Structure formats: C-alpha cells, structure tokens
Amino acid sequence: MKPQVVFVLGGPGAGKGTQCARIVENYSYTHLSAGDLLREERSRTDSEFGQLIDSYIKEGKIVPVQITINLLRKAMEETMKADEKKFRFLIDGFPRNQDNLQGWNTEMDGKADVKFVLFFDCSNEVCIDRCLERGKSSGRTDDNRESLEKRIQTYLQSTRPIIELYEKQGKVQRIDASRSVDEVFADVKNILEKDD
C-alpha cells in the first residue's frame, strides 16, 4: 500500500497544527509536520544536518528540500512498518515552494499518492496576532514579530503559488481559518467524510 497524503498548507498561525491534532483524534491519519521533524532533527546531538537546519530556521528561510523529504519519507516508512493500517498522512507545512514541490515530485513519484491539499486561509493580521499570542508560551524562537514578518513574506512569495498550482488541478480544499477552532473543524470534517 502506498502512503495516501494530504498536504496541509496555510500561513504561520493559520491553525494547521491545531486542526491536524483534531483530525488525528477523529480519523485514521498520522500527522507529520515538516517543521517539527526539522526541529527534532536540529536538536538531535548526532544529527549531520542539525547546524545547517538551525541557521535556516533562524533566518526564516526554507531548508533544502532533500533534507525535508528524507525526514518525511523516513517517518512515513517507520509509521507504516509499525502498523500497516496507518497509511494516511497529513503533511503539514510542505511543500512550501516550487523547489519543494519539484523535489517531492522527483523523489516521491509513484511512491506516495497526494489526495488533495487542505488550505487554511487566513488574513496576515490574524496570523500575526495568533503567533505573537502563541510565542508567549510556545518557546518557539521564530514566534516574534521580526521572524513573523519574514515568514509571512516567504509564505506569500513561495507557498501561495504552490496552492494556486494545485487549485488549477482541482486538488485544493479551501477553508476559512479565521473562525473559531470548532467552526473550522466542522468544515474539515465535511471534507474528510466526503473523501472517505
């Protein structure tokens, strides 16, 4: 069985992680966050990529695609090896740019099926406010205004065109993410139940 993948995209603070956690509780999906995998790899003392990843994250830049895809592929393989019923994956925060997408298409062609893109659409103002609020408790080094401005610019320049590309293929499920967690999840449920 090939992994069945749903890409989860949206600006910083759009609620991707929160909604993915809800989906995992209610459906047979495994949540893989490209950012979390990179942060874990960065903090592993024996990691060959740790320092490299660290400098990219601090600068608000996108980590080289081979590193990210390697971590994603390894995580999917390990999950499916542990339990063959777990072949559905939510990949959150990837692909973030053209280079990511090309890398995925090259490396994963025929190895995984992308079902659709779940796009959490939210204004920049709401995203920034949410991240600053989260920064008070998350301890994330990139939840400050300066990093956020950079991350939003990166998102608008790099990730939005990817979403538009998938839209042309009719593969995007767009959700208004400016509403409450429950309202957003109600839309998510409708989409996933249609897909089942």
Swiss-Prot record:
Residues annotated as transmembrane: none
UniProt-annotated binding residues for a ribonucleoside 5'-phosphate: 39, 61-63, 93-96, 140, 151
Residue positions binding ATP: 13-18, 134, 179
GO BP terms, alphabetized: 'de novo' pyrimidine nucleobase biosynthetic process; CDP biosynthetic process; UDP biosynthetic process
UniProt keyword annotations, A-Z: ATP-binding, Cytoplasm, Kinase, Nucleotide-binding, Nucleus, Pyrimidine biosynthesis, Transferase
InterPro entries found in the cross-reference section: Adenylat/UMP-CMP_kin, Adenylat_kinase_CS, P-loop_NTPase, UMP_CMP_kinase
Recorded GO MF terms: (d)CMP kinase activity; ATP binding; CMP kinase activity; dCMP kinase activity; nucleoside diphosphate kinase activity; UMP kinase activity
Cell location: Nucleus; Cytoplasm
Residue sites binding CMP per the record: 100
Pfam family of the protein (one): ADK
Record keyword ATP-binding present: yes
NMP: annotated span: 33-63
Enzyme Commission numbers on file: 2.7.4.14, 2.7.4.6
Gene Ontology CC: one annotated term: cytoplasm
Keyword Nuclease among UniProt keywords: no
HAMAP family: Adenylate_kinase_Adk (MF_00235), Adenylate_kinase_UMP_CMP_kin (MF_03172)
Cited PANTHER family: NUCLEOTIDE KINASE
This protein's name: UMP-CMP kinase
Organism: Danio rerio (Zebrafish)
